[in-house]
Amino acid sequence: MSEARQQSSSEGGGDLSDYEEKFEQCCTLLEQRIIQDDQIPRNVRRAAKQAIEALKEEGQSPGVRASTAISTLEEVVNDQNTPEYARTVLLQVIATLEQVKDEV
C-alpha cells in the first residue's frame, strides 16, 4: 500500500505537465484567435497578452497562475466592445483554466 502512495506522489510531477499542457493550449488559443486578430479591440488583446504572461510565470503555483489569468480575462469578457466570437474563445479559455484551478 505504501508503494502505491509513493507512486502516486511521484506522479505528482506528471500532473504538473498536465497543467502546463492546458496552459499551452490556452496560450495558443489566445495568441491565434485573440491577439493576432486586428478586429478585436486593443484592451481585449492586451488582456489576452497579460493572461499569457500570467500563465508563463513559473515562479507561481499552477492554481495562482490560472486564477490570475482568469481574473484578467473576466475583466474584458463582459465588455460590450468584445465581439461575440472573441467572447466565446475567452470563455473557453476561462473554463479550461477553471479546471486547473479546481484540481489544485
From Swiss-Prot:
Record organism: Methanopyrus kandleri (strain AV19 / DSM 6324 / JCM 9639 / NBRC 100938)
InterPro entries assigned to the protein according to its UniProt record, in alphabetical order: Ta0600-like_sf, UPF0147
Family recorded in the similarity comment: Belongs to the UPF0147 family.
SUPFAM superfamilies: Ta0600-like
Name assigned to this protein: UPF0147 protein MK1586
UniProt xrefs under Pfam families: UPF0147
Gene3D superfamilies with a match to the protein in the record: Ta0600-like
